[in-house]
Amino acid sequence: MVRDKWKDKVWYTILAPDMFDNVEVGETPADDPEKVIGRVLETTLGDVLDDITKHHIKVFFRIYDVEGTTAYSKFEGHRLMRDYVRSLVRRGTSRIDGVIDVVTKDGYKVRVAGLAFTTRRAKTSQQRAIRKEMFKVIEENAKECDFDEFIRRCLSISEEESIPEQIKEAGRKIYPIRQAEIRKTEVLEEPNGLPPYEAVGDRATPELASY
């Protein structure tokens, strides 16, 4: 007689990190709680916050602990959906991309991909200058904030500041900016010196590996 493995599985409720008020974000089945640790949940920020204006933002949570049938997760990164980014492209304008690694005030190393669009085509020198301002804004916020607040600012959900809005304002001093975004973030290292995936005993996901 073939044993039905699904009957042995338990459904675990996944909670978002503290920065998202530990709301329920999904479920995952397993026949052993140890097998739950290290799994990555992909959802949208819109679903997490119950905000239809944020459905273009994918967020990734990695499970690091299980208590009973509750699984606790860490923020691992985010990414703007490709269709959304494509919708921002306009003819006769410039797209300015930049990727920078920063360390938050509490010791998290984060890779951040910024993105800006000008109202018209900018000169190469102007694009370089805007990128420099973009990096300056991101670095200053990282030095000023702990990890949770920095990510909230990247996602424009902080009550204090929005990094995309700061980039837009800083870039306008050089050339008019139509839109600025943080296209992607990825946690590279936690304060313990280990990559987050080693800290929870699992490999990094290919989803977050490419910039």
Curated annotation (Swiss-Prot):
Pfam families: Ribosomal_S3Ae (PF01015). One of its GO terms (molecular function) is structural constituent of ribosome. Transmembrane segments: none annotated. Residues 192-211 are annotated as: Disordered. GO terms for biological process: translation. One of its GO terms (cellular component) is ribosome. This is Small ribosomal subunit protein eS1. The lineage of its organism: Archaea, Methanobacteriati, Methanobacteriota, Methanomada group, Methanopyri.
